[in-house]
């Protein structure tokens, strides 16, 4: 099969497009033909080995050079070999630790979920990492609550706006002026231009501030957070992947944030990924959530997809299709 192999840390051009042996499923796994995948910040942090903690997460053996392997955590495809829960021909999607940037991948059955019935493989591939993160970030949000999504036009943000609206919350958004119409179309009310408006001095108050962009300090954000509100840290600018954990540490240390709840939304650490994907499939099938796909790249152009994603200007998700005939929306 064809796969993009990582054999060194570096830019997208460091990935090598190779012929590698077809994987053989172990007990509890099924073989899946990958129809589409995507690129996430999680992927390009491991590609570059930046920040350095990403290298420690390879198991401690990749400080100077990563273990040879395949990146990619978002998967939408079709089952090839039978398991106990899935049969050949079943359309599935999953959030993997890695391995989706290949034609085939062996997946533990307990990570797989049936694809949303109304979505194509390309659309479904946009969901796992971003949509799971967004849904985890909004746990506990009830109808009538006020939610602010900072970074509303990216992968996580576009799902967060839709999900918060579907949960009955009032949603405001922070993004560029160029993406304001997109945010409104997804359900946002007030939209702040991050270049021109200081949303932290808007005078508004929110029950939840979901920070995807990571360009304002948690102490500035507390100005718009209710005293019993929740600050949810998701991401930060390139090279500052550990920033969300820093927010949680500062809150735990006490001070002005001590009365407020600060949490970290981490899809990778989620223990019931398949169940969450099943929940998201139901939201999608009801029409409450639709993936926003900015660009779709052919598989052999994966390096360009990495470069575009890393530039940080994508509206929604960057999807990579493997050119296999599959389900259309």
Predicted regions and their residues:
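Glycine-rich beta-strand-centered segment in the early N-terminal region that forms part
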Residues: 21-38, 52-98
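Short glycine-centered segments of the SAM/dcSAM-binding site in methyltransferase folds
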Residues: 91, 146, 170, 229-230
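Glycine-rich phosphate-binding loop and adjacent beta-alpha segment
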Residues: 212, 216-288, 323-329
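C-terminal capping/lid region of NAD(P)-dependent oxidoreductase domains
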Residues: 281, 286-295, 303-329
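A short acidic, Gly/Pro-enriched loop at the edge of an enzyme's catalytic core
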Residues: 201-208
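Mid-domain Rossmann-like dinucleotide-binding core that forms the NAD(H)/NADP(H) cofactor-binding site
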Residues: 125-193
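NAD(P)H dinucleotide-binding glycine-rich loop of Rossmann-like/cofactor-binding domains
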Residues: 61-76, 91-151
């Amino acid at each position: 099969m064809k796969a993009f192999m990582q054999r060194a840390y570096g830019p997208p051009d460091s990935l090598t497009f190779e012929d590698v042996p077809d994987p053989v499923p172990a007990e509890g796994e099924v073989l899946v033909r990958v129809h589409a995948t995507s690129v996430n910040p999680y992927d390009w942090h491991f590609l570059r080995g930046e920040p350095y903690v990403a290298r420690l997460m390879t198991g401690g053996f990749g400080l100077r050079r990563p273990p040879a392997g395949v990146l990619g955590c978002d998967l939408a495809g079709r089952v090839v070999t039978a398991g106990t829960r899935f049969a050949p021909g079943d359309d599935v999607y999953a959030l993997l630790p890695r391995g989706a940037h290949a034609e085939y991948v062996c997946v533990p059955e307990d990570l797989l979920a049936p694809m949303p019935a109304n979505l194509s493989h390309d659309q479904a591939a946009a969901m796992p990492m971003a949509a799971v993160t967004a849904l985890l970030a909004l746990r506990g949000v009830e109808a009538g609550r006020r939610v602010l999504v900072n970074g509303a036009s990216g992968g996580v943000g576009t799902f967060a706006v839709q999900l918060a609206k579907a949960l009955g919350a009032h949603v405001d958004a922070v993004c560029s002026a160029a993406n304001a119409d997109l945010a409104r179309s997804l359900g946002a009310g007030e939209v702040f231009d991050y270049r021109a408006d200081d949303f932290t001095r808007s005078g508004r108050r929110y029950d939840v501030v979901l920070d995807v962009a990571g360009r304002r300090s948690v102490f500035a954000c507390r100005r718009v957070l209710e005293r019993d509100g929740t600050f949810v840290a998701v991401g930060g600018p390139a090279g500052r992947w550990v920033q969300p954990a820093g927010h949680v540490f500062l809150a735990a240390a006490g001070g002005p944030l001590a009365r407020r709840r600060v949490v970290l939304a981490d899809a990778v650490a989620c223990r019931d990924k398949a169940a969450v994907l099943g929940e998201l499939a139901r939201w999608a099938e009801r029409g409450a959530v639709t993936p926003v796909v900015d660009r779709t790249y052919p598989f052999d152009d994966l390096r360009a997809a990495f470069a575009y994603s890393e530039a940080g200007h994508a509206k929604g998700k960057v999807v990579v299709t493997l050119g296999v005939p599959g389900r259309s929306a």
